Protein backbone atom coordinates (compact mmCIF):
# COMPACT_ATOMS: atom_id res chain seq x y z
CA UNK A 1 0.00 0.00 0.00
CA UNK A 2 1.10 3.54 -0.66
CA UNK A 3 1.53 6.19 2.00
CA UNK A 4 -1.44 8.05 0.48
CA UNK A 5 -3.68 5.01 0.88
CA UNK A 6 -2.54 4.60 4.47
CA UNK A 7 -3.22 8.29 5.15
CA UNK A 8 -6.64 8.07 3.51
CA UNK A 9 -7.52 5.03 5.64
CA UNK A 10 -6.38 6.86 8.75
CA UNK A 11 -8.98 9.59 8.22
CA UNK A 12 -11.61 7.51 6.43
CA UNK A 13 -11.23 3.98 7.78
CA UNK A 14 -13.03 1.07 6.16
CA UNK A 15 -15.00 -1.17 8.48
CA UNK A 16 -16.17 -4.77 8.30
CA UNK A 17 -19.66 -5.00 6.80
CA UNK A 18 -20.68 -7.63 9.34
CA UNK A 19 -19.19 -6.66 12.71
CA UNK A 20 -18.20 -3.03 12.07
CA UNK A 21 -14.59 -3.52 13.21
CA UNK A 22 -12.02 -1.37 11.42
CA UNK A 23 -10.35 -3.29 8.59
CA UNK A 24 -6.59 -3.66 8.63
CA UNK A 25 -4.21 -3.70 5.68
CA UNK A 26 -5.03 -6.54 3.28
CA UNK A 27 -8.66 -6.92 4.41
CA UNK A 28 -11.46 -5.98 2.00
CA UNK A 29 -15.15 -5.75 2.94
CA UNK A 30 -14.84 -8.29 5.79
CA UNK A 31 -12.44 -8.69 8.68
CA UNK A 32 -10.58 -12.00 8.90
CA UNK A 33 -12.72 -13.17 11.83
CA UNK A 34 -16.02 -12.64 9.96
CA UNK A 35 -14.56 -14.02 6.73
CA UNK A 36 -13.45 -17.24 8.41
CA UNK A 37 -16.80 -17.53 10.20
CA UNK A 38 -18.90 -17.64 7.03
CA UNK A 39 -20.79 -20.98 6.84
CA UNK A 40 -19.19 -22.90 3.96
CA UNK A 41 -21.06 -25.86 2.46
CA UNK A 42 -18.07 -27.86 1.15
CA UNK A 43 -20.43 -29.23 -1.55
CA UNK A 44 -17.66 -28.86 -4.15
CA UNK A 45 -15.87 -31.74 -2.43
CA UNK A 46 -18.82 -34.15 -2.94
CA UNK A 47 -19.93 -35.71 -6.21
CA UNK A 48 -23.71 -35.80 -6.62
CA UNK A 49 -24.18 -33.14 -3.96
CA UNK A 50 -27.59 -31.62 -3.27
CA UNK A 51 -27.04 -28.75 -5.72
CA UNK A 52 -26.18 -31.12 -8.58
CA UNK A 53 -29.22 -33.24 -7.70
CA UNK A 54 -31.48 -30.19 -7.99
CA UNK A 55 -30.53 -29.92 -11.68
CA UNK A 56 -31.03 -33.58 -12.58
CA UNK A 57 -33.69 -34.03 -15.24
CA UNK A 58 -33.90 -30.28 -15.84
CA UNK A 59 -30.65 -29.30 -17.53
CA UNK A 60 -27.40 -31.16 -18.19
CA UNK A 61 -24.60 -30.20 -15.80
CA UNK A 62 -21.12 -31.62 -15.27
CA UNK A 63 -20.90 -30.40 -11.68
CA UNK A 64 -22.54 -27.75 -9.52
CA UNK A 65 -22.05 -26.34 -6.06
CA UNK A 66 -23.20 -23.78 -3.58
CA UNK A 67 -20.41 -22.06 -1.70
CA UNK A 68 -22.11 -20.74 1.46
CA UNK A 69 -25.16 -21.70 3.50
CA UNK A 70 -27.91 -19.09 3.54
CA UNK A 71 -30.05 -18.43 6.60
CA UNK A 72 -32.66 -15.74 7.13
CA UNK A 73 -31.08 -13.05 9.26
CA UNK A 74 -27.61 -14.58 8.82
CA UNK A 75 -24.34 -13.06 7.68
CA UNK A 76 -24.60 -14.44 4.13
CA UNK A 77 -28.02 -12.83 3.75
CA UNK A 78 -26.56 -9.54 4.93
CA UNK A 79 -23.75 -9.73 2.35
CA UNK A 80 -26.11 -10.63 -0.50
CA UNK A 81 -28.49 -7.85 0.49
CA UNK A 82 -25.58 -5.40 0.49
CA UNK A 83 -24.57 -6.58 -3.00
CA UNK A 84 -28.02 -6.72 -4.54
CA UNK A 85 -29.87 -3.80 -2.97
CA UNK A 86 -27.25 -1.38 -1.64
CA UNK A 87 -25.07 -1.25 -4.74
CA UNK A 88 -21.97 -2.58 -3.00
CA UNK A 89 -20.32 -4.25 -5.99
CA UNK A 90 -17.09 -4.84 -4.07
CA UNK A 91 -18.92 -7.41 -1.92
CA UNK A 92 -19.60 -9.51 -5.02
CA UNK A 93 -16.05 -9.36 -6.27
CA UNK A 94 -14.62 -10.25 -2.85
CA UNK A 95 -17.06 -13.16 -2.49
CA UNK A 96 -16.19 -14.34 -6.02
CA UNK A 97 -12.48 -14.26 -5.21
CA UNK A 98 -13.02 -16.11 -1.94
CA UNK A 99 -15.17 -18.77 -3.60
CA UNK A 100 -12.71 -19.29 -6.46
CA UNK A 101 -9.75 -19.57 -4.08
CA UNK A 102 -11.42 -22.38 -2.16
CA UNK A 103 -12.88 -24.19 -5.17
CA UNK A 104 -9.53 -24.22 -7.00
CA UNK A 105 -8.13 -26.60 -4.38
CA UNK A 106 -10.63 -29.25 -5.52
CA UNK A 107 -9.97 -28.83 -9.27
CA UNK A 108 -13.54 -27.55 -9.67
CA UNK A 109 -12.46 -25.29 -12.55
CA UNK A 110 -10.51 -27.94 -14.49
CA UNK A 111 -11.66 -27.96 -18.12
CA UNK A 112 -13.56 -24.68 -17.82
CA UNK A 113 -12.46 -22.08 -20.35
CA UNK A 114 -15.06 -19.33 -19.92
CA UNK A 115 -16.91 -17.72 -17.01
CA UNK A 116 -20.40 -16.57 -18.05
CA UNK A 117 -22.40 -14.56 -15.51
CA UNK A 118 -26.19 -14.92 -15.50
CA UNK A 119 -27.42 -11.94 -17.53
CA UNK A 120 -29.96 -9.40 -16.30
CA UNK A 121 -32.64 -7.99 -18.56
CA UNK A 122 -31.51 -4.59 -19.87
CA UNK A 123 -34.37 -2.83 -18.06
CA UNK A 124 -33.33 -4.33 -14.71
CA UNK A 125 -29.66 -3.61 -15.38
CA UNK A 126 -30.42 0.05 -16.15
CA UNK A 127 -32.51 0.32 -12.99
CA UNK A 128 -29.89 -1.32 -10.74
CA UNK A 129 -26.88 0.03 -12.61
CA UNK A 130 -24.98 -3.26 -12.62
CA UNK A 131 -25.38 -7.04 -12.65
CA UNK A 132 -24.50 -8.65 -9.30
CA UNK A 133 -23.71 -11.94 -11.06
CA UNK A 134 -21.03 -10.10 -13.05
CA UNK A 135 -19.45 -8.90 -9.81
CA UNK A 136 -19.11 -12.49 -8.54
CA UNK A 137 -17.89 -13.71 -11.94
CA UNK A 138 -15.27 -10.94 -12.09
CA UNK A 139 -13.85 -12.12 -8.75
CA UNK A 140 -13.80 -15.74 -9.95
CA UNK A 141 -12.12 -14.72 -13.20
CA UNK A 142 -9.40 -12.73 -11.42
CA UNK A 143 -8.43 -15.66 -9.19
CA UNK A 144 -8.71 -18.46 -11.77
CA UNK A 145 -7.36 -16.60 -14.78
CA UNK A 146 -10.35 -17.91 -16.77
CA UNK A 147 -11.76 -15.13 -18.97
CA UNK A 148 -15.27 -13.80 -18.38
CA UNK A 149 -17.67 -13.01 -21.24
CA UNK A 150 -20.91 -11.10 -20.68
CA UNK A 151 -22.07 -11.24 -24.29
CA UNK A 152 -22.43 -14.96 -25.12
CA UNK A 153 -25.69 -15.44 -23.20
CA UNK A 154 -28.61 -13.02 -23.27
CA UNK A 155 -31.85 -12.79 -21.33
CA UNK A 156 -34.64 -12.88 -23.91
CA UNK A 157 -37.46 -11.35 -21.87
CA UNK A 158 -38.19 -9.42 -18.70
CA UNK A 159 -39.35 -11.39 -15.64
CA UNK A 160 -40.77 -10.31 -12.31
CA UNK A 161 -38.81 -10.90 -9.13
CA UNK A 162 -38.50 -14.51 -8.02
CA UNK A 163 -38.12 -13.59 -4.36
CA UNK A 164 -41.58 -14.82 -3.33
CA UNK A 165 -41.93 -17.74 -5.74
CA UNK A 166 -41.59 -21.42 -4.86
CA UNK A 167 -39.10 -23.74 -6.56
CA UNK A 168 -41.47 -24.93 -9.32
CA UNK A 169 -42.69 -21.39 -10.08
CA UNK A 170 -39.07 -20.24 -10.33
CA UNK A 171 -38.26 -22.97 -12.87
CA UNK A 172 -41.36 -22.07 -14.89
CA UNK A 173 -40.48 -18.37 -14.73
CA UNK A 174 -37.05 -18.95 -16.31
CA UNK A 175 -38.04 -21.58 -18.88
CA UNK A 176 -36.57 -20.57 -22.27
CA UNK A 177 -35.42 -17.29 -20.73
CA UNK A 178 -31.81 -17.39 -21.92
CA UNK A 179 -30.28 -17.70 -25.36
CA UNK A 180 -26.70 -18.28 -26.51
CA UNK A 181 -25.18 -15.87 -28.99
CA UNK A 182 -22.68 -17.60 -31.22
CA UNK A 183 -20.10 -15.27 -32.77
CA UNK A 184 -19.47 -15.61 -36.48
CA UNK A 185 -16.71 -18.13 -37.05
PLM segments and residue spans:
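Glycine-rich phosphate/pyrophosphate-handling loop used in enzymes and phosphotransfer proteins
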Residues: 1-185
Amino acid sequence: MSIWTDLWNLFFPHSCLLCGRQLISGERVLCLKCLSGLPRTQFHLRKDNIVECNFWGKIPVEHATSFLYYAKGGNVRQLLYELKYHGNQEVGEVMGRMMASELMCSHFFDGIDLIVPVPLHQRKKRLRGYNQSECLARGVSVVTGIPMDTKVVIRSRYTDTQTHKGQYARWENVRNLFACIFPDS
